[in-house]
Curated annotation (Swiss-Prot):
MF-aspect GO terms: structural constituent of ribosome
Organism: Photorhabdus laumondii subsp. laumondii (strain DSM 15139 / CIP 105565 / TT01) (Photorhabdus luminescens subsp. laumondii)
CDD domains: Ribosomal_L29_HIP
UniProt entry keywords in alphabetical sequence: Ribonucleoprotein, Ribosomal protein
Keyword Nucleus: no
Gene name of this polypeptide: rpmC
UniProt entry tagged with the keyword Nucleotide-binding: no
Record protein name field: Large ribosomal subunit protein uL29
Alphabetized PROSITE patterns for the sequence: RIBOSOMAL_L29 (PS00579)
The organism's place on the tree of life at top rank: Bacteria
One BP term from GO: translation
Family that this chain belongs to: Belongs to the universal ribosomal protein uL29 family.
Length: 63
């Protein structure tokens, strides 16, 4: 997910996206804990995407 794509979204869409990413992160962590996660790089990608969304929400709140 690119930052430019996220910038075009509204605050409500960003909040929905954040919720989806947090759920995905939870599922990936559970898979990693049980040894089922083959692609461990997905955890890092999701974490970075969560940071991007949170940053944009903060920017939009201040604007």
């Amino acid at each position: 997910m690119k930052a430019q794509e996220l910038r075009e979204k509204s605050v409500e869409e960003l909040k929905t996206e954040l919720l989806n990413l947090l759920r995905e992160q939870f599922n990936l962590r559970m898979q990693a804990a049980s040894g089922q996660l083959q692609q461990s790089h997905l955890l890092k990608q999701v974490r970075h995407n969560i940071a991007r969304v949170k940053t944009l929400l903060t920017e939009k709140a201040g604007a």
